[in-house]
Amino acid sequence: MRALITFALLCLLYITVQGKVSTPKVHVYSHFPGEYGKPNTLICYVSSFHPPDISIELLKNGQVMSDTKQTDLAFEKGWQFHLTKSVAFTPEKGDEYTCSVRHMKETKKFSWEPNM
């Protein structure tokens, strides 16, 4: 009987965790301060999301950038997840760099601000 109650509680916990949807928090930044014509690394850090149904793309002027690197999916306390995607780039005046994040069925874009 004790095992049955424990199993039921674990099932309830699993259903509760699986049913909770957390919208991702997104930060787009560069490794060094943005300077036009200077090599840098564009980084998109996505955190605090659940479930882990997510895809991240780095875009230059709306086109997917090649040679990107992505960390393995990792989880935080509360079964929320985080990922980082990055790419080497050299910002040029007039170019727009964005991070496109699709979580579940919703896609949002976040822009890199060079602060120049």
Curated annotation (Swiss-Prot):
SS bond partners: 44-99
Top-rank taxon: Eukaryota
Domain Ig-like C1-type: 24-111
Key words, A-Z: Disulfide bond, Immunity, Immunoglobulin domain, MHC I, Secreted, Signal
Broad class of where this protein is predominantly found: secreted
Signal peptide: 1-19
Compartments (UniProt record): Secreted
GO cellular component assignments: extracellular region; late endosome membrane; lysosomal membrane; MHC class I protein complex; MHC class II protein complex
Molecular function in Gene Ontology: MHC class II protein complex binding; peptide antigen binding
Swiss-Prot/TrEMBL GO biological process terms: antigen processing and presentation of exogenous peptide antigen via MHC class II; antigen processing and presentation of peptide antigen via MHC class I; immune response; peptide antigen assembly with MHC class II protein complex; positive regulation of immune response; positive regulation of T cell activation
CDD domains: IgC1_beta2m
Keyword Secreted assigned: yes
PANTHER family xref list: BETA-2-MICROGLOBULIN, MHC CLASS II-RELATED
Family: Belongs to the beta-2-microglobulin family.
Function, as annotated: Component of the class I major histocompatibility complex (MHC). Involved in the presentation of peptide antigens to the immune system.
Subunit: Heterodimer of an alpha chain and a beta chain. Beta-2-microglobulin is the beta-chain of major histocompatibility complex class I molecules.
The protein's name in its UniProt record: Beta-2-microglobulin
